[in-house]
Regions:
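Acidic-residue sensor for enzyme active/binding pockets
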Residues: 45, 101, 211, 237, ...
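A short glycine-rich beta-strand->turn/loop micro-motif centered on a GG-aromatic cluster
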Residues: 69-70, 213-214, 286
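Shared catalytic-loop signature of beta/alpha-barrel
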Residues: 217-234, 239-335
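N-terminal capping/lid subdomain adjacent to the active-site entrance of alpha/beta enzymes
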Residues: 1-184, 188-193, 197, 201-204, ...
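Catalytic beta/alpha-barrel core
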Residues: 156-163, 184-189, 206-216, 232-240, ...
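Long, low-complexity, intrinsically disordered polar/charged segments
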Residues: 121-130, 174, 200-210, 245-263
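Residue-level marker of alpha-helix boundaries and capping positions
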Residues: 95-96, 136, 212-213, 264, ...
Length: 367
């Protein structure tokens, strides 16, 4: 039975700045939801940033939504499934919902002595690990960084791009490392459909895909772009639910989908999107949001499902953090092992949690 919900706040430094088309991150402000039960606790990580630049959600907004609207819905017998149904009338706020759902799911699976991977239907014990490379200061730095990641064993490289920093980046990486490496690009919605002729130059480089080239609400633009270029179009920010995924596929706005649980409201919805894509033969992969070990563990369970046929952004902990909040995930022969113990399979290290503060405790009403 659920007894209380706690909010935990803290921060963690990144080992190096991570620059995208919408800004540069040097650290992460963190929000964890801790679901307290009779015998176990569950943890969920919020993926929202401190500013509403990736999406309209941001960390302080999530704190308020969780505290004012989501927690009061909970009862002692609440489950992740019942919470999703109860929270449905609240529009949007997917990252807030996903944060609470993850904690509830971790708790109930620990009570049931089932791993998240088994619950979701995973059929892999390890997943291929890709790495996301932020925009660098110059091409020499880019070549150095990509070379270091390939030496560490990453099986796929994703380059962040933006107008004025795109074609030459890809050309340089292909020239330096050859056509054999798996390579894709991510625009984070930095272009418009008027850039189609420019983006068509990417066709020469045999990319796996171009991720979210246009604004998230421009499905018509993505349809037109997909008709004009040969590089497969993958949607990220545009996909916020099963319905938006179905709509994008019906319109042929994309041929690949990046599934991020935090962006779609949680792991239950992410599983539905996976199942839809699997039924249609559409490849999916699991994106990253600079998660610590709490979110990374859960993402590994999701990425172990059969439809995840492309390497995702689930990198080793050391890619982002000198020391993670949980025991670190490591890359071995290009893969990361999927946790197979109960729940998400990891817990915060006590010495790391000591740097965090429990900022709120909400007792859950009895039925």
């Amino acid at each position: 039975m659920l007894r209380a919900i706690e909010l935990w706040r803290g921060g963690i430094e990144l080992v190096s700045p991570f620059r995208t088309s919408f800004g540069t991150d040097t650290s992460r402000d963190l929000l964890y939801v801790r679901a307290v039960g009779d015998a176990n606790v569950g943890w969920g990580e919020c993926v929202a940033g401190t500013e509403p630049n990736y999406s309209s959600e941001y960390l302080e907004n999530c704190v308020e939504v969780i505290s004012r609207f989501l927690v009061p819905m909970l009862r002692a017998d609440s489950t992740a499934q019942s919470f999703v149904a109860d929270a449905a009338p609240i529009r949007g706020n997917y990252m807030s919902k996903a944060n609470v759902e993850a904690a509830l799911l971790d708790l109930q699976l620990r009570d049931q002595k089932i791993s998240l991977a088994k619950f979701l239907g995973a059929n892999k014990t390890k997943v291929p690990s890709g790495v996301s490379v932020g925009i660098q200061n110059n091409l020499n730095d880019l070549v150095r960084v990509v070379g270091e990641y390939l030496a560490q064993g990453y099986v796929r490289v994703k380059l962040k791009i933006e107008p004025g920093s795109d074609i030459e980046l890809v050309r340089t990486v292909r020239k330096e490392f050859g056509d054999e490496i798996l390579l894709q690009v991510d625009a984070n919605a930095a272009y418009t459909v008027a850039d189609a002729k420019h983006l068509k130059q990417l066709d020469a480089f045999n990319l796996l895909l171009i991720e979210q080239p246009l604004p998230e609400d421009d499905l018509a633009g993505h349809v037109e772009l997909a008709r004009q270029i040969n590089t497969p179009v993958c949607l990220d920010e545009s996909i916020t639910s099963l319905d938006t995924a179905r709509g994008a596929l019906d319109l042929e706005a994309c041929s690949v989908i990046n599934i991020k649980p935090g962006r779609v409201g949680g792991y239950l919805e992410a599983k539905k999107i996976h199942d839809l894509c699997l039924s249609r033969g559409v490849p999916v992969w699991c994106g990253g949001m600079l998660e610590t070990g709490i979110g990374r563990a859960a993402n590994l369970a999701l990425a172990a499902l059969p439809g995840f046929t492309l390497p995702g952004d689930i990198s080793a902990s050391a890619r982002y953090f000198a020391r993670d909040i949980t025991p670190p995930f490591v890359i071995e022969s290009g893969h990361i092992s999927v946790p197979n113990t109960v729940g998400i399979g990891v817990e915060p290290l006590p010495e790391m949690l000591a740097n965090f503060k429990r900022t709120a405790v909400f007792e859950v009403a009895k039925n």
